[in-house]
A protein has these predicted regions:
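Short, basic, glycine/proline-bearing loop/turn elements
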Residues: 1-5, 66-71
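Histidine-anchored nucleotide/phosphate-binding helix
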Residues: 13-20, 150-153
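Thiamine diphosphate
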Residues: 37-51, 55-66, 70, 80, ...
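Short, conserved loop/helix-junction motifs that constitute active-site signature segments
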Residues: 20-23, 185-187
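Mobile "lid/hinge" segments at catalytic clefts and subdomain interfaces of large enzymes
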Residues: 21-28, 34, 58
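A short, small-residue-rich loop immediately preceding and capping a beta-strand
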Residues: 1-8, 27-30, 140
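Acidic, glycine-rich active-site loops and adjacent beta-strand->loop/helix elements
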Residues: 5-12, 19, 31-37, 75-79, ...
Length: 187
């Protein structure tokens, strides 16, 4: 079972997706227009608090004592492919795919972008590292990750500040990783 609408309208669906989380129903929720940058539709169509509310369900345990919902907000086309893969493999809980409607640049890749995006299966991973000892860690999900790539470049060029950009597609999955991995990604 799957359903889709604008992310801002997920509020109307909250009782349904909360119950599907508690009942371990593997529903796929697809929400688009994920950011406040969708300004042409006016303030009624700008999701501000919705992602934070959704992330709380990742922290809520279902009756099996597991994360009750998998919430994924991919940063580019490669992460979206990985997110779909994760959604199809998740047969125990609902999955939320929170997608952008904006034209977003694909994130830079050292090797193959899809192979690098597979690291998203751990919830968060280092997308870009400027310098050996970053002074700043920039963390985002979804469409804001590309913005942080640009910000990291400016920090290095204009201020000489080395940074590390992290794509955090799922806070819940990231928190389940070993402490050593979490500290590697976010020292």
């Amino acid at each position: 079972v799957a359903c889709a609408t604008f992310f801002v309208f997920s509020d109307y669906m909250k009782p349904a997706f909360r119950l599907s989380a508690l009942m371990q129903m593997p529903v796929k929720y697809i929400w688009t227009h994920d950011a406040f940058r969708v300004g042409e539709d006016g303030p009624t169509h700008q999701p501000i608090e919705h992602e934070a509310q959704l992330r709380l369900l990742e922290k809520m345990q279902n009756h099996a004592g597991k994360m009750s919902m998998l919430a994924l907000r991919p940063a580019d086309a490669a992460e979206t492919s990985v997110a779909w893969k994760m959604a199809m493999e998740n047969t125990e809980t609902p999955t939320a795919l929170v997608l952008s409607r904006q034209n977003i640049n694909d994130l830079p890749a050292v090797t193959d972008r899809y192979t690098e995006a597979l690291k998203a299966e751990k919830g968060a991973y280092i997308v870009q590292k400027n310098g050996e000892n970053p002074k700043v860690i920039l963390i985002a999900s979804g469409s804001e990750v590309a913005t942080l790539i640009d910000a990291a470049k400016l920090l290095l060029e204009r201020k000489g500040i080395a940074s590390q950009v992290v794509s955090a597609i799922s806070e819940g999955l990231f928190r389940q990783q070993p402490t050593a991995y979490q500290e590697e990604v976010i020292p």
